[in-house]
UniProtKB/Swiss-Prot annotation:
Family annotation (InterPro entries): AP2/ERF_dom, AP2/ERF_dom_sf, DNA-bd_dom_sf, ERF_plant
DNA-binding region(s) in UniProt: 60-117
Location of the region described as Disordered in the Swiss-Prot/TrEMBL record: 1-20
Source organism (scientific name): Arabidopsis thaliana
Induction behaviour: Induced by salt, heat and drought stresses. Induced by osmotic stress. Induced by jasmonate (JA). Induced by salicylic acid (SA). Induced by abscisic acid (ABA). Induced by ethylene. Induced by infection with the bacterial pathogen Pseudomonas syringae pv. tomato DC3000. Induced by the bacterial pathogen Pseudomonas syringae pv. maculicola ES4326. Induced by wounding. Down-regulated by infection with the beet cyst nematode Heterodera schachtii.
GO cellular component: nucleus
Protein origin, superkingdom: Eukaryota
Keyword Electron transport: no
Record's keyword terms, sorted: Activator, DNA-binding, Ethylene signaling pathway, Nucleus, Plant defense, Stress response, Transcription, Transcription regulation
Subcellular location: Nucleus
Protein name from the UniProt record: Ethylene-responsive transcription factor RAP2-6
Amino acid sequence: MVSMLTNVVSGETEPSASATWTMGHKREREEFSLPPQPLITGSAVTKECESSMSLERPKKYRGVRQRPWGKWAAEIRDPHKATRVWLGTFETAEAAARAYDAAALRFRGSKAKLNFPENVGTQTIQRNSHFLQNSMQPSLTYIDQCPTLLSYSRCMEQQQPLVGMLQPTEEENHFFEKPWTEYDQYNYSSFG
């Protein structure tokens, strides 16, 4: 062992045969050295590091993860049920993060930790205006046509029933008129 260290310290590359065999036969460890890198100084270092960092790691958003095939999935934990709520799969990480933010605001209100806290006020205004334009359009037109509350209620009475609503058939109407059996009364009383 001492002779091996002497060889290493003195710079000899080949140890003597006696030193190798007296220590026992061990596998030699191969050492690899990387070729020396050119020394980069100043702002070139930061630019190179920034460019390599931006290529390696996309920005991470709360509640968002990337699927192996490249799409972005968003989910949030429901604080009331202690379960995960699936928000969907999105083309971009930003879209998934915005879906998370909307759900976080719905679940936690003003205490929510958001990905885009600076957009809270503008999102609410845009969402409300979009909601009013799309879903409240029929009601708004009736309000415009009926200036007073009384005339509005009369306008609402004159509306046609919703398309797609099923009206009960004659047989179904008679079903509800049948008297209850003792079994029906027992079941109803156990739930009430």
